[in-house]
Amino acid sequence: MAYASRTGTRRNIEAMRRAGWRMLCEPSQLGRYAGDRPPLPFALDNGAWGCFQRGVPFDEEGFARLLEWLGEDADWIVVPDIVQGGLESLRFSLAWLSRVLSFAPALIAVQDGMEAADVQGLLGENVGIFLGGSTDWKLKTMREWGAVARSRGAHFHVARVNTAKRIRLCQDAGAHSFDGTSVTRFACNLPRLDNERRQGHLFAGMEAGR
């Protein structure tokens, strides 16, 4: 399944709808859409990456509000994490895990400094992997994380995928879903990326009703 960051642009929304793409929503969007629910099926990101990019602390209050508003209808929810936090990030995520699971399936963000053994015992039908981290690390370890998720029957999602080449790498790693911003910004990118994601075995588990 393909996700793109939420947008209010009608042309892009309709292009996503026709192609069967979904939306990835996060706390910074709470005020932007004046309480309007997402127009397409969606998952929830915790917003930690956006806060990191803006140089501000993680918005715990905003994430909690997002959970209450949309959590029960989300495909899955990324558990709060600490960008570039390594194992400290995992400890932070574990403090939130039960709360997130009370709303929807949860994905634990894995990043530089983490190994499969750190999360393997947590994974299962309702707890999966959200592959973040630095670009080099993500590309280097993607297959390993895919194998770990597969061994536990867990969902495997890859973050920040905006090119056809990256989609092919997700296919090879056995990812069930990915997200990106390319389609959100430019609807003209959707046909090329959607054609690529329909090739091969990408998301076969989800499409078979896993």
PLM region spans:
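Glycine-enriched alpha-helix->loop->beta-strand junction motifs that scaffold or abut catalytic
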Residues: 18-22, 38-40, 72-74, 101-104, ...
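Distinct, well-ordered alpha-helical segments
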Residues: 88-95, 115-124, 141-145
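Alpha-helix-loop-beta-strand connector modules within alpha/beta enzyme cores
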Residues: 41, 94-107, 140-163, 202-209
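His/Asp/Glu-enriched short active-site or ligand-binding loop at hydrolase and phosphoryl-transfer sites
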Residues: 126-139, 162, 179-182
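Glycine-rich phosphate-binding active-site loops on the catalytic face of alpha/beta enzymes
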Residues: 29, 49, 133-135, 169-202
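Non-catalytic, usually N-terminal nucleic-acid engagement modules in DNA/RNA processing proteins
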Residues: 1-95, 192, 202-209
